[in-house]
């Protein structure tokens, strides 16, 4: 069977430019779809994308190329699009696997995510760069202040069960026992100044234990030692991410160990 295609969604910044190293390492023998968000990459766009429009565009693109589903890879704000897909009746059937980098979608009910990025004063070099070149840029600031709806963007671990290769409603207590392989990878940054990584990692660990108790392993969590987005400029971690994407693209993934991995 052919490998699953990839849908990649970038985060806040300058579009795909600082993801070129990662994109260049994606598998060469499958289709790659790149979803650009002009409203958060320093373009003069007043409004962000509508949820339904985004879901329909991604679903239609996959259908046009004959792909029933895909591996969704997203960084930072781009992970909200994955949340939209998983919450949509049609969209969730298109999400076979995911690789989420610095996801801002977990525990969004915690106000620190939006507050830290938009309103907090920077305290280190990385924070200064993000503050002056990203969060205070006119159109990015407008997008985050006026078009970021946490209740639509939030993701729960149970949402992974919407994926097409697991096929269970997140309201169901019945976790299939015959899909004992990891379909989803979450990579967090231990020094993240935006995502509350401590609470998020503890939440995901607890959900891993809960899912295992029901006889199902569907996601893993890895930890990068660095700040938000820094993993994308470390060649070793770019290779690690690319390897995870390659694994998720396999039509029949092997069983991998699940756990919270702390790597430098």
List each model region and its residues:
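Short, surface-exposed "cap/lid" segments of acyl-processing enzymes
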Residues: 1-41
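Acidic catalytic loop of the alpha/beta-hydrolase fold
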Residues: 106, 190-195, 228-230
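Conserved acidic catalytic loop of the alpha/beta-hydrolase fold
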Residues: 52-70, 83
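Active-site nucleophile loop of the alpha/beta-hydrolase fold
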Residues: 37, 99-109
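Short alpha-helix in the alpha/beta-hydrolase fold that links the catalytic acid
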Residues: 22, 196-210, 236
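Gly/Ala-rich beta-loop-alpha elbow adjacent to hydrolase catalytic centers
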Residues: 73-83
């Amino acid at each position: 069977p052919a490998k699953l295609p990839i849908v990649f969604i970038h985060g806040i910044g300058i579009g795909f430019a600082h993801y070129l190293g990662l994109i260049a390492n994606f598998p060469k023998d499958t289709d790659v779809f790149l979803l650009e968000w002009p409203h958060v990459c320093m373009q003069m766009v007043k409004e962000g994308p509508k949820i339904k429009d985004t879901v329909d565009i991604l679903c239609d693109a996959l259908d046009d190329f004959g792909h029933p589903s895909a591996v969704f890879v997203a960084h930072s704000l781009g992970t909200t699009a994955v949340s939209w897909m998983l919450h949509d009746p049609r969209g969730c059937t298109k999400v076979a696997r995911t690789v989420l980098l610095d996801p801002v979608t977990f525990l969004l009910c915690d106000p620190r995510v939006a507050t830290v990025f938009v309103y907090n004063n920077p305290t280190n070099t990385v924070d200064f760069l993000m503050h002056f070149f990203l969060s205070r840029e006119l159109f990015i600031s407008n997008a985050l202040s006026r078009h970021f709806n946490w209740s639509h963007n939030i993701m729960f671990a149970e949402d992974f069960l919407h994926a097409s290769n697991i096929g269970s409603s997140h309201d169901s207590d019945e976790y299939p026992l015959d899909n004992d392989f990891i379909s989803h990878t979450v990579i967090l940054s231990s020094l993240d100044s935006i995502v509350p990584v401590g609470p998020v990692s503890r939440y995901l660990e607890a959900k891993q234990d809960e899912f295992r108790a029901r006889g199902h392993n569907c996601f893993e969590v890895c930890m990068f030692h660095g700040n938000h987005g820094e993993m994308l400029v470390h060649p070793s971690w770019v290779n690690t991410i690319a390897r995870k994407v390659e694994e998720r693209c396999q039509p029949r993934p092997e069983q991998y160990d699940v756990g919270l991995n702390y790597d430098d």
